[in-house]
Amino acid sequence: MKKGTQRLSRLFAAMAIAGFASYSMAADTIKIALAGPVTGPVAQYGDMQRAGALMAIEQINKADGVNGAQLEGVIYDDACDPKQAVAVANKVVNDGVKFVVGHVCSSSTQPATDIYEDEGVLMITPSATAPEITSRGYKLIFRTIGLDNMQGPVAGKFIAERYKDKTIAVLHDKQQYGEGIATEVKKTVEDAGIKVAVFEGLNAGDKDFNALISKLKKAGVQFVYFGGYHPEMGLLLRQAKQAGLDARFMGPEGVGNSEITAIAGDASEGMLATLPRAFEQDPKNKALIDAFKAKNQDPSGIFVLPAYSAVTVIAKGIEKAGEADPEKVAAALRANTFETPTGNLGFDEKGDLKNFDFTVYEWHKDATRTEVK
């Protein structure tokens, strides 16, 4: 994590001790809850979400706000824990906040959406990819990222085309996000007529995967797909290298964090990951990227610009609706397209993006990435 992001994370964590932190000076405001992990093992993804959302709030407010009102970001810490996410959602409702950017992890997002839908709160997640989140007929739940059933086939087809002659293992962390996307990858690979030699779950939070790695070595595994987050992937990479497992590793966007290099070191070189397109490299976003850099913030984090887009969509939806009424804003979101740093976004009836592309990248030990052609 870069120094600016580390300072930001410490600030968020200190303020979140009281349950939330608020960012606005105006009396006439529209509050937006920024719900995600301030603490916990994947707090880095919460840092990305907040950096993007707060930048959008700042820039919208400087441009005279929304319908004469200023936006106010209110931070809530769910630690990517489902039970804590429910508590956060109830607090958002009790605080009278009607719009949410978050949550971050699929496993914490889904239970929170039940409360938001029942209580008339509009939520847009910039990062939760589990299809189940938007498959229950809810009208107030949206996202500015693609789904596992979009991302999984991209990885599966890549594996089937380029590693069909290798012995393949598909692992996951037994969580909604990780197991869901691993299952999609396995299905795509097997549909191509290729056998998956090992399909197995590990426990998120465990530190020693040597027994599993020994099993992979015994099976002659040469390619490993892991559905989960960077803490476990980093340890798998490091311990596999130490054990002499000669295999290529691949994962979803949940492993695409600079912290994986801090955990795995040189073993992170060559890891493959499906990630959103590098929106920070789009020339049309140069002024925005410069604004992040002026704050010593890293705009390349995978959820930074999707979070910026989530706030942008809420603001433009309020303008289209003519008022900050969640149901009217939801109708406006489905009826229009919105220009954002992550493209012209349009939503289907479920609240999913009509179009979103995942791309395969190769990770490097200096925490940079290059697109695989």
Please place each PLM-identified region on the residue numbering.
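Extracytosolic ligand-binding ectodomains
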Residues: 2-7, 11-15, 26-373
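Sec/Tat signal peptide C-region and signal peptidase I cleavage site
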Residues: 20-26
